[in-house]
Amino acid sequence: MSDDNLISRPLTAGAHVSLRSMQEVAMNDRNASKMLSTYNVAYWGGNYYDVNELGHISVCPDPDIREARVDLAQLVKKMQLEQGQRLPALFCFPQILQHRLRSINAAFKRARESFGYEGGYFLVYPIKVNQHRRVIESLVNSGEPLGLEAGSKAEMMAVLAHAGMTRSVIVCNGYKDREYIRLALIGEKLGHKVYLVIEKMSEIKMVLEEAERLNVVPRLGVRARLASQGSGKWQASGGEKSKFGLSATQVLQLVDMLREANSLESLQLLHFHLGSQLSNIRDISTGVRESARFYVELHKLGVNIQCFDVGGGLGVDYEGTRSQSDCSVNYGLNEYANNVIWGIGDACNEHGLPHPTVITESGRAVTAHHTVLVSNVIGVERNEFCEPQPPEAGAPRALESLWDTWQEMQEPENRRSLREWLHDSQMDLHDVHTQYAHGMLDLTHRAWAEQLYLSICNEIQKQLDPSNRAHRPIIDELQERMADKLYVNFSLFQSMPDAWGIDQLFPVLPLEGLDKPPERRAVLLDITCDSDGTIDHYIDGDGVATTMPMPPYDPENPPLLGFFMVGAYQEILGNMHNLFGDTAAVDVYVFPDGTVEVEQTDEGDTVADMLEYVQLNPEKLLEHFRGQVKETDLDTELQAQFLEEFEAGLYGYTYLEDE
């Protein structure tokens, strides 16, 4: 780690507390507690994220060492000031990865001890969740038992290269050709326990042929296609219509083929997969019970299954609602481990069978928490209100009607409902827009009507009561209509593709200002030229809203924003819409003495990098631009300036940069 990429300093989040009155501290503590509730940090944060007494987000990468924490807002600003850190950037906490791994292993250890389970347990990390070197190496160097899973040839090569650090279990999923199969068998020859999971019947013939050529006894697994299926956004990866796995008939055929080839002893692993991000613990229990029946029946057929791979599905609570919604879970690590271990052990005990080694492929649960995308707001559009002025004499009827509604609202004795005022003003505004489109009103008329309508909405909003059920739909409608628009320096398609593709919710909140109660609502928009580049769902207390609660902020100097729990899938699924590339990335290590070490692991893609992806040679582009400039009658100094700017842009960041 070079000195240029290192920050080592104490960060004491409460350094200024002694300068404030105890009353102010108590008030800010109450506000911080309210903001914790508003954004549900206590539940999705997993004890890794918190709001400190300054109202800033703090990060504790290892909750077992509470004194090791860092103020994220202070860290980012220090790096911007001292190192010129560009935003957006991923702030990655490898210590969170290692703590997640330890926590899952510990949960299964407790479950095995609690239920007298005699088999072992292995967490196998499916690298498809996040293949970055920093992630894989942080996990394999953690000192914890860990296996690796590959789903393609490229992933298999990465896994084989890193497996030397663990000498552990390798699970090979996905569709396979002979090259993939040979790589797996070579891994077995090198001393690893490599399980080739049969996903389709045509693979078994190739496996046996290549094993004979390499003179190695293969370890085989079979993926059974269950009738059980989880619910949610990823339910299609499980169930009878799943893309992967063998039906009951095909499982029997596989056993017969292996028996005829005198290779039945090679079939050692049973695998199933209910789906990713399983929200309901009942779905997990049901799937484990059904798969345990496969284990029992295979033993009856003489198959000595030694490993029981329950696949992925261990979810994380993106919302913090602790519910069965698609982006939440109604269980924790301990309950998950208990259900898996008890379900398998109960079936084994009932039929007098040995307890197999349990494998889980819990990639999302390991990686999601460890990465935060931090970015800056580049523009704010917010509604400003001034005292409405009456329309000019002889104004069109639609304008007069809007003004009448406003005046009625100022009369204390008026008993018309808030809903009625809203509907009347909406109809009047619709009339204004229609008449404007037909040339009956001018632009000044339209602007006056729209501003008065906003004032009416603002007045109605002040009088609404969230505890009144009848008011809630109106509250939601007006919050969307009146929300500030924050234009954020990032690409939704590159950094949070699941938010765009499947409406997944990620926790988003300011990194500072959280010692003040929320006063405004906002929606976040990215900088792509695409109307889909907006975040549509936000955490709001124990629910989800279409706007984000915001503490008071200066629109000329808005706070930094953090997009949390983006460590699983988002980096690798991100696409290049508008040629926005990978963001910069840093690894952050936090120590009990208050020091923080930061290593720049990725500078982020340049414009030239992205152009080359689409076969646009940067040097040729520069040459073409130079030719255009030389053909002009601009003076030599100006030509040189334009060429310098173009070349600097080619090798600059794809995102917006301050001068």
UniProtKB/Swiss-Prot annotation:
Query: How would you classify this enzyme at the top EC level?
Result: lyase
Q: What Pfam families does this protein map onto? A: Arg_decarb_HB, Arg_decarbox_C, Orn_Arg_deC_N
Query: CDD domains per the record?
Result: PLPDE_III_ADC (cd06830)
Catalysis: reaction(s): L-arginine + H(+) = agmatine + CO2
Q: Which pathway does it take part in?
A: Amine and polyamine biosynthesis; agmatine biosynthesis; agmatine from L-arginine: step 1/1
- Keywords assigned: Decarboxylase, Lyase, Magnesium, Metal-binding, Polyamine biosynthesis, Putrescine biosynthesis, Pyridoxal phosphate, Spermidine biosynthesis
Record-annotated residues binding substrate? 308-318
Entry-linked InterPro entries: Ala_racemase/Decarboxylase_C (IPR009006), Arg_decarb_HB (IPR040634), Arg_decarbox_C (IPR041128), Arg_decrbxlase (IPR002985), De-COase2_CS (IPR022657), De-COase2_N (IPR022644), De-COase2_pyr-phos_BS (IPR022653), Orn/DAP/Arg_de-COase (IPR000183)
What SUPFAM superfamilies would the database entry show? Alanine racemase C-terminal domain-like, PLP-binding barrel
Entry superkingdom? Bacteria
- Name the Gene Ontology molecular function terms of this record: arginine decarboxylase activity; metal ion binding
Q: What is its EC number?
A: 4.1.1.19
**Cofactor(s) this protein requires:** Mg(2+); pyridoxal 5'-phosphate
Q: Name one GO biological process term.
A: putrescine biosynthetic process from arginine
Residues bearing PTM N6-(pyridoxal phosphate)lysine: 128
The Swiss-Prot or TrEMBL record describes its family as follows:
Belongs to the Orn/Lys/Arg decarboxylase class-II family. SpeA subfamily.
Stated role: Catalyzes the biosynthesis of agmatine from arginine.
Protein name, as recorded:
Biosynthetic arginine decarboxylase
